[in-house]
Amino acid sequence: MTQVSKTIAKPSGNANLYSRLFSYYRVYKKLIFIALAGLCLFSFVDAGMIYFVKPLIDQGLSKADSHTLQLGALLVVAIFFLRGIASFTSSYAIAYISSKVTYRIRQQAFDKLLYLPRTYFDLNSRGSLISKIIYDTEQLSQSFSSAVVIAIRESVIILVLFSMMVYNSWQLTAIFLVIVPIIALIINKVSKRFKNISHKLQNSMGQVSNKTEQAILNQQEIVLLDTRTQISAQFEKTNNNNRQQNMKLQATSAISNPVIQLIASFAIAAVLLLASIDQVLNQLTPGSFTLILIAMGSLLKPLKQLSNINQQLQKGLIAAKSLFSFLDQQEEHDIGTKQLSKTCSNIRFNNFSFTYQGKTQPALSNFSLQIKGGTSVAFVGESGSGKSTLARLLLRLYQSPKQSILINDIAIEDYSLSSLRAQFAFVSQDIVLIDDTLANNISFGCNRDVTDSEIEQAAINANVMAFAKELPLGLNSEIGENGRNLSGGQRQRIAIARAMLRDASIIVLDEATSALDNHSEKHIQQALTRLTQHKTVLIIAHKLSSIQHVDEIIVINKGRLIEQGNHKTLQAKAGYYQSLYQSQ
C-alpha cells in the first residue's frame, strides 16, 4: 500500500483542508498553468467581445462606416476561434487534473479500507464506507474543480467588464459598487446554511447506500420472510430524507440567486435615471451607453455564478473532512519484527479477558489454555460463548492484552502480521470467492507463486476435481460473482484446496461442515483429513458429531473454559458437554 496519506498533515480547519487538498494538485503544476491561462484567455475574450459594440454603433452604424462593419465581420470569426481554443484547452486540462485527483484519492481510500482494523468495521456501516469511496471522492474533486473554474473565469469576466465600464463612465459605474457589500452579506448568510445542509445530505446519502446494500445482500431472506413491503417502507423513509435535504439545498440556492439579481436590477435602474441627467448624458455616445448597459447586464451572470461558489465549496469541504478523517484512521497495529516459522506450533493462552469495543460483557473471561503443536483441538459451546473470538484474536483481527497469547513461546504481537497470518489457513462457512476461474480462486491469497500442477494437485486432494471435470473448461471455468454457480459443498471444497495450497502450519476450521448435507459433508471430511495431516488444527464447531476424533475438546460457556478433555472423557463426566451433545 502506498502510504501517501500519512505524509500529509491532518486537517484542523478549513485552511488546512485547502492546504492538504492542494497537495494532490501540486504535482500537476504545468497543467494547472495551462488550464488557468486558457480560462483567463477565454474570459478575457468572452467579456472583451462586448467592447466591439461601441465602435460598431458609433462608427459603423452612426457614421455609416462600411469598413468598420467589414472589419467587425472578420474579428467575430477570429474571436470565436480563439475563444473555442481557449475553452477546449482549459476544459480538457481541468477534466484531466480532476480525474487524476479523484483516482488518486479514491485509490488511497480503498487501500486504507484494506488496512483498517476489524473494530472500525464493527463501528461503521458498510453503506457509509462505500459512500466515502464512491460518492465523497467524486464530490471532493468535482466541487473544488468547479469552484476554481467559476472563481477564475467569472472574476476575470467581472474585471474586464468593470474596467470597460469605468473607462466609459466612472459615474455610472460607481452606482454598481453600492450593491457589492449587500451581495457579500447575502453570500455569507447562505454559506452557513449550505454547510449545515451539505453535511446532512452527505449522511443521508450514506444511509441510502447502506439500505440498498443490505437489500441486495439479504434479497433471499427478504423474499422468504415476505418483508418486501416493510423493507420498501424503511428505504422510502431514508430515500425521502435524502430528497428533503437535497431540496433544502436547492431551495437555498434558488432563493439566493433571484435576491442577488433583484438587488443588481436596482443598480441598473439607478444608472438609467442618472444617465438622463444632461451633464452625464452629454458625455456619453450611443455606443458607450449601450456598452455600459450590456456590461452591467452581463455582470449579473458572473455575479450569480460567484454566489454559487459557496455551494460547491461547502459540498467539497464536507466531503474533504469526511475523506481525510477516514484516511487518518489508525491502521492495524503492526510493530512486530519476528518471523513465525513453518513448524507445528504450540499455542498458549495466558489467563486473559477480552471485551469487544462498545460492549460491556466480556467475550472471554480469565481464559487459559495450552495447545501442543501437531494436535487437533475443538472448541464447542453455544452461539456467543466466545469460540470464534479465540480465532479472531489468534489472527490478530482484534488486539488481545499484551503477552496474553503466545505461539512457540513468543507473544503474537511480536510477530509481524504478514508472518503470523501466513502460517494460518482459515476455512469457514463464509467463503470469499472472486469472479474468476476455479484455478484462480484456488490460488487466491496464496503467499507464494504456484504452478498449474500444484493447483491441480490441491484440487484433487480437496475433491474439487470431482465437480470441476464436469465443467466445460475444467479448472479454467468461470464460477460467477461470489461463486453463484456453485453449491455450498463445492464452495467449501475450493476453500479447502486454497488452504492446502497455502500450506500453513495452523489450520482453523470455523464450523466448516455445519450447513452441509451428508453427501457434501463426506467429500469435505475426506478433504479435511488430507488438509490437517501433521498440522496444528483448531476447530470451531456446532456439529459435535464431527469432532469425536479430535485430540482434545474445549468446552466454553459465556467466555469461560468450563470443561476439557476428549470425547469419551467428557461423556463420562456427564456435564455441560454431554448436555450439548444430547441436545443434537
UniProtKB/Swiss-Prot annotation:
ABC transporter domain: residues covered: 347-583
Domain ABC transmembrane type-1: 33-315
Its membrane topology: Multi-pass membrane protein
Transmembrane intervals: 32-52, 68-88, 146-166, 167-187, 254-274, 280-300
GO cellular component: plasma membrane
UniProt keyword annotations, A-Z: ATP-binding, Cell inner membrane, Cell membrane, Lipid transport, Membrane, Nucleotide-binding, Translocase, Transmembrane, Transmembrane helix, Transport
Enzyme class: translocase
Subunit composition and interactions: Homodimer.
Family affiliation: Belongs to the ABC transporter superfamily. Lipid exporter (TC 3.A.1.106) family.
Name of the protein in question: ATP-dependent lipid A-core flippase 2
Gene encoding the protein: msbA2
